[in-house]
């Protein structure tokens, strides 16, 4: 099922991302720079390992994981988190845990777009990507 996510995706819209980053605890300057970035996501699958590369003027990051297995991640805003990604009703659902806090990033496919819903403490950001 992860095969449907494989490809290159370009951010086309972002809603409420600054409020979400603020809730996560991202500082003002980092929020402003990150909020202006238009990342490209490159998702690949190799032998059951999913890799998500994010490339932007803000920062380039890469995570690789197997579904259902916890892994260490350093986020673009330099948080050290424990992440786990599961497939839930066709969506890739990532949970990041750090310092007693938790956020969920849900990636789902809708109408040839990939929609990211980032949620923390009731604050939701929606970011929409189209195939590049």
Swiss-Prot record:
Free-text comment on this protein's domains from its UniProt entry: Forms a beta-barrel structure that accommodates the hydrophobic ligand in its interior.
GO cellular component, one term: cytoplasm
Protein name: Fatty acid-binding protein, adipocyte
Positions occupied by motif Nuclear localization signal: 22-32
Location of Phosphotyrosine modifications: 20
Keywords tagged on the record: Acetylation, Cytoplasm, Lipid-binding, Nucleus, Phosphoprotein, Transport
MF (Gene Ontology): fatty acid binding; long-chain fatty acid binding; long-chain fatty acid transmembrane transporter activity
Subunit (UniProt): Monomer. Homodimer. Interacts with PPARG.
Lineage: Eukaryota, Metazoa, Chordata, Craniata, Vertebrata
Function: Lipid transport protein in adipocytes. Binds both long chain fatty acids and retinoic acid. Delivers long-chain fatty acids and retinoic acid to their cognate receptors in the nucleus.
Pfam families: Lipocalin (PF00061)
Keyword Acetylation set for record: yes
Phosphoserine carried by residues: 13
Chain positions with N-acetylcysteine modification: 2
Subcellular location(s) per record: Cytoplasm; Nucleus
Entry binding sites for a fatty acid: 127-129
């Amino acid at each position: 099922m992860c095969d449907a996510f494989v490809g290159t995706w370009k951010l086309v819209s972002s809603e409420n991302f600054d409020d979400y980053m603020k809730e996560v605890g991202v500082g003002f300057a980092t929020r402003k720079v990150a909020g202006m970035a238009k990342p490209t996501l490159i998702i690949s699958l190799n032998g059951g390992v999913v890799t998500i590369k994010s490339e932007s003027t803000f920062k380039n990051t890469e995570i690789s994981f197997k579904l259902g297995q916890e892994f260490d991640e350093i986020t673009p805003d330099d948080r050290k988190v424990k992440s786990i990604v599961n497939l839930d009703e066709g969506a890739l659902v990532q949970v990041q845990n750090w310092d007693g806090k938790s956020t969920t990033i849900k990636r789902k496919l809708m109408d040839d777009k990939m929609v990211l819903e980032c949620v923390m403490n009731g604050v939701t950001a929606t970011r929409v990507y189209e195939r590049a």
